[in-house]
Regions:
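Cytoplasmic helix-loop-helix junction between adjacent transmembrane helices
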Residues: 98-136
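Short amphipathic helix-loop junctions that connect adjacent transmembrane helices
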Residues: 25-37, 227-243, 247
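Intracellular juxtamembrane helix-capping segments at the cytosolic ends
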Residues: 26, 108-122, 311-324
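Helix-loop-helix hairpin linking two adjacent transmembrane segments in secondary transporters
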Residues: 94-96, 133-180
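Juxtamembrane intracellular "pre-TM" segments in multi-pass secondary transporters
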Residues: 1-2, 182-213
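Helix-to-loop junctions at the C-terminal end of transmembrane segments
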Residues: 54-67, 257-271, 355
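C-terminal membrane-cytosol helix-exit motif in multi-pass small-molecule transporters
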Residues: 169-189, 377-382
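C-terminal ends and interior cores of transmembrane alpha-helices
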Residues: 76-91, 281-293
């Protein structure tokens, strides 16, 4: 592994810790600070909205100042946002906590650029492996973040969870140190006479469309069900918080641990076949959730949900980086991310409402049309490619 990829991978671990910490704690903190019960999951959703809103700008900023400066800036911004969250909890200010979660999401929009930086640091044939390595690093963030946050939750007397976000500020500052050793690729500066295809031309390309649709709805379906799972388990079905936590931990592990083999599977079988495998795991999730809600079935369902997401998201990202030219990369990446995380944000925001208005079984059935959409777009891309060949 080259040095840049090592640095990107290590930085990804620490930069990604806000996501699992916020998923783990923001709903609980929201339930204690929120003036209205219905708003308790808003901080969690606002982090995702923050990612969606700032994704395009993150790509644009990096196109101007470069990867290294962009990641350094993001590290400082995330540290500030975590400290603001700590102050909001200390002050028992729900609305300031919501703002801090939104800002944490803004910082996370830069973190999602690490996968592109990894792909750019290796030769084309090694892109699937590089993506898998960076995605695998996220599992360490998923384990490291919540455990450190939980360990430090009582750091400040009479101010529960302030220490969790202070420790998050320390974690998000680590990449600022690591990235000083990152060496950006030296690209010869030439006068730009061609800025690449426009957005309509990019989206009309079958493989680009397949990449965007796969990534967007893989994230949307996963977020829709994952956001509702703790509420359905703990609040509606009265499972203990520890059992609910176990299910979420299994889910997060299954999202990233398969990255050990996903890169090799992509190289061997191709992107579309792994997408169909991911769809198969999503279908299994729906079937299990529809017919039974025992503790062991929740574990299996959320593991299959995580595994399906891994196959779909890494395949979608791998397809994306192969579907644009060098001069189009920031435009294509920004366009992809703003669509992916906007759709994810809508799914996450609607999860609590849909659960309260319908049922857990109905929520799972709602995902079926979007699963079919992924299949149809992938089949179309495959058929058009066969015709061209």
């Amino acid at each position: 592994m080259n040095r840049n990829l090592w640095i990107i991978t290590l930085s990804q671990i620490f930069s990604f810790t806000p996501a699992p910490i916020n998923v783990f704690l923001s709903g609980i903190i929201g339930s204690t600070l929120s003036p209205v019960k219905a708003l308790q999951t808003v901080p969690t959703s606002l982090m995702i909205v923050g990612i969606a809103v700032f994704s395009f700008f993150a790509a644009k900023i990096m196109s101007i100042i470069g990867r290294k400066a962009g990641f350094l800036l993001a590290s400082l911004f995330s540290t500030f946002s975590a400290l603001l969250a700590a102050y909001a909890i200390w002050d028992k200010n729900f609305y300031l906590f919501c703002l801090s979660c939104f800002l944490i999401g803004n910082g996370m929009s830069f973190t999602h650029q690490y996968r592109f930086a990894a792909a750019e640091s290796v030769e084309k044939e090694f892109i699937p492996k590089a993506l898998s390595i960076v995605m695998l690093a996220t599992i360490f963030a998923a384990l490291l973040g919540p455990n450190i946050a939980n360990f430090n939750k009582d750091l400040f007397d009479d101010h529960l969870y302030v220490g969790s976000y202070v420790s998050l500020a320390v974690l998000t500052f680590v990449p600022f140190i690591l990235l000083n050793f990152y060496e950006p690729q030296s690209v010869p500066r030439v006068k730009k006479t061609y800025e690449g295809r426009n957005y309509l031309q990019l989206i009309s390309q079958p493989r680009f469309l397949q990449a965007v649709v796969t990534s967007a709805f893989a994230y949307a379906i996963m977020s829709f069900l994952m956001t509702a799972t703790p509420i359905n388990m703990h609040v509606l079905e009265h499972y203990s918080l520890s059992k609910t936590g176990v299910v979420i931990q299994f889910h997060i592990i299954s999202m990233f641990l398969p990255s050990l083999i996903t890169g090799r599977l992509l190289t061997k079988f191709g992107h579309s076949k792994i997408i169909y495998a991911g769809v198969f795991f999503y279908v299994l999730t729906v079937i299990i959730c529809f017919f039974d809600t025992s503790f062991i079935n929740y574990i299996f369902a959320l593991v299959f949900l995580g595994l399906g997401w891994n196959f779909l998201y890494i395949s979608g990202t791998g397809l994306l980086v192969l579907s644009y030219n060098e001069e189009e990369k920031f435009k294509a990446q920004g366009f992809n991310d703003i669509l992916v995380f906007s759709i994810q944000a809508l799914a996450s925001l609607s999860a609590g409402y849909m659960l309260s208005m319908t049922s857990w079984k109905t929520m799972n059935l709602i995902t079926i049309p979007f699963i079919i959409l992924i299949i149809l777009v992938s089949l179309r891309a495959d058929l058009l490619e066969k015709k061209l060949n």
